[in-house]
Amino acid sequence: MTDELVGELIDTVAWVLIEDGRILCARPRGKAVFYIPGGKREPGESDEQTLVREIAEELTVTLVPATVEPVGVYEAVDGAARVRMSCYRAEYRGELRASSEIAELAWFGYRERPQVPPVDRLLFDELHAAGALR
């Protein structure tokens, strides 16, 4: 599909947190689908600034900026939009808890892949192929 046939580009950043072969996912209030935690950047924000802000808003933890490392950039068509997700790993401080905008947190293995959007599935595939996601 060419860019002319796809609507807007949704440019996001996401935090990849894997423990025991599972990746942390969040389901926002009012949504049925789980996402890798993160979100859209505000004007003038870097990926790192967006990541730190979004994770603090969604999960009430503080990412350690000096530990932010790129994982990869993934792109997929989702409905009428093209979604680009820049993924990063980072250490954090605090206790993982869902904020008021998040209905549920879950640790997903590869078998839960159908419960996430197309762009997240690309990351799931790569992590599974590398043996990081069970």
What are these regions (language model features)?
Residues T62-G72:
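A short coil-to-beta-strand element that immediately follows conserved catalytic motifs
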Residues R29-F34, A98-R134:
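Nudix hydrolase/Nudix homology domain
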Residues T2-I23:
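Conserved N-terminal beta-strand and adjoining loop/helix that marks the start
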Residues I18-E58:
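Conserved Nudix-box catalytic region and its N-terminal flanking loop in Nudix hydrolases
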Residues D20-R22, E91-E95, Y110-E112:
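Short loop segments at secondary-structure junctions
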Residues V61-T62, G94:
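Intrinsically disordered, low-complexity, charged terminal extensions of DNA damage-control enzymes
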Residues I10, I18, I36, P65, ...:
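Short connector loops at helix/strand junctions that flank enzyme active sites
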Residues D11, V73-A98, A103-W107, L123, ...:
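Active-site-adjacent beta-strand/loop module that shapes the phosphate/pyrophosphate-binding cleft
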